[in-house]
Amino acid sequence: TLLSSIILIWVGKKIDDFDVLKFSFFVISLLAISTFTFSKINSITFLFIAILLMRFSGQGMMSHTASTTISRYFTNTRGKALSTGWFGLSTAEFLMPVTIIYALTIMDWRNIWIIISVSIILFLPLVSYFLVKEVKLSSREDDNEVAKENIKQWKRSEVIKDYRFIIIALNMLAMPWIATGIFVYQSFILSAKNWGEYTIAQSFMVYSIASVLTLFVAGYLIDKFTSRKLLIYMNIPFLISLLILIYFQSPVSSFFFLGLIGVSNGFANVLGSSTWAELYGVKFIGSIKALTTALMVFSTAFGTAFFGLMIDFDFSIEQISMISGGYILISLILLFLIKNKLNPTIL
């Protein structure tokens, strides 16, 4: 995971320089190779290579390519476009586990990976061709309102020196690192709270529904009010969810706990792309998004390690939640202090 995030910083920025269709074919091919590699695993070394390719091409480059392209070529309806794109991902997260579980009952797991790889090669290039065949590098700026408004197009080297980027990133990274820790160590939460073994699994239905519904609400609100004005509210439901985890013991509270995380996740998915485009322009959005996506991937690894370390040091789930909530609160306060400065630079 860590290695894939480092590679993503360099490879991800190339989307600014290449034709979208060709870049998409590259990412699709890489994903097909990674899934096929899983079908041939016979050693720890091969497993490492397969996971590296999967994390890089799947979680990293596929989402990076989609969100970057939408952020660049949509302006007035960017929020709705991003929410529609993320809806596809959320739908897959809901349907694919069920599909794979069923497939495991009728065939060997290696054959499943081969089928996935072949399906990727057969269908995704065709879909990509019809979706972005007319999108060229030359069409990027001509009729884009950002260009007409003479908004500064920030390079990545400039963005990383901007204090606003650091503060926004602190808020953006709360979801991936804390939520990943919660999801990975859900058995620890079940044990600590004396909840039934299926409590969190059932609560995930509420999480999924809340996340998907919030996607579309967020998309509409972004187009109406801008990402910059909504950003301050993104992690408030998440903070409340941690307070629920700290102070409530009833199994019913898990539905509110994960439901509120779903609300913040829905907002974070859309705001995580649209905010950078609004604030820093779209000319170099690929390199900027490559950095933020890499940070997201890195933070998921950090979250797993952090929660594991805290558990090893005998921290309770309430104490871990307090630390996590403290992080969210501090990042929210910092964001509140600069909320009036979250405007693009006009040339």
Task: Kindly give the residue locations of the regions a language model identified.
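A late C-terminal transmembrane helix in Major Facilitator Superfamily
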Residues: 93, 282-314
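Central cavity-lining transmembrane alpha-helices of secondary-active solute carriers
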Residues: 1-12, 205-217
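Helix-loop-helix hairpin linking two adjacent transmembrane segments in secondary transporters
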Residues: 89-135
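Cytoplasmic helix-loop-helix junction between adjacent transmembrane helices
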Residues: 52-87, 281
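Structural signature of the two symmetry-related core transmembrane helices
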Residues: 22-36, 229-243
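Flexible cytoplasmic inter-helical loops of multi-pass small-molecule transporters
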Residues: 132-154, 347
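Extracytoplasmic gate region of multi-pass secondary transporters
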Residues: 157-215
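Hydrophobic core of transmembrane alpha-helices in multi-pass small-molecule transporters
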Residues: 45-61, 253-267
